[in-house]
Amino acid sequence: GGDIDDLKEVSIPEDLFESSSGFNENGTAQFIAQVWDRAGNSIVGSVSDSILNIDQTLPIGISLELTSSNSINPDMVIPGDSITFQLNTSENIEAPFFVINGDDYENAIGLGKSWMLVYYAEEADDGVIEFRVNFNDIAGNPGKPISEALDSKTLIMDGTPPELSDITLFTSNKY
């Protein structure tokens, strides 16, 4: 208990809120409270300054493109190369979160529906570059994580220098 001026947290069940008159996608909601005490006295508060924007639509990853800076083979990455991840979504999102070969990257740049991250492959282990992109729309609705490029392109890290073995020299010179 406490005075009428005390702040109280009230929860409205999801199904009750969604079935209320005027609830619709892209709509807004404001709240007003009516409170009764044990003696039956009541008071109606003023309309809340807070406006709730209703957004239940999940964002969709429209495309994710991978581009290697390797000029000899665009499907390979070697030390010194970079990989550009270009993400496009169905609606404006917060900055996406990348996990590349088990490491977290939160430094994507972009705005709205288009985001890019440049990954420098210096420390990557040899093999396929594995990744997952997590993203939420502005309302916080999560998109389905993306773990492959739209065209299913994969990039392979090869940081092992070539070796020569069993070299035999011969000459046709008589001398």
How would you describe each model-predicted region?
Residues 2-18, 111-118:
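Aromatic sugar-binding surface patches on proteins
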Residues 16-28, 120-128:
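Surface-exposed, short loops/turns at beta-strand junctions within beta-sandwich domains
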Residues 30-36, 130-136:
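Extracellular recognition modules
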Residues 36-42, 136-145:
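Short, solvent-exposed loop/turn segments at the edges of extracellular beta-sandwich modules
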Residues 37, 48-67, 148-172:
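Flexible, low-complexity linkers/stalks enriched in Thr/Pro that connect modular domains
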Residues 42-48:
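Extracellular fibronectin type III
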Residues 71-81, 171-175:
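Short, solvent-exposed loop/linker segments at the N-terminal edge
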Residues 80, 89-95:
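Short proline/glycine-enriched turn/loop motifs at strand-loop junctions of beta-rich domains
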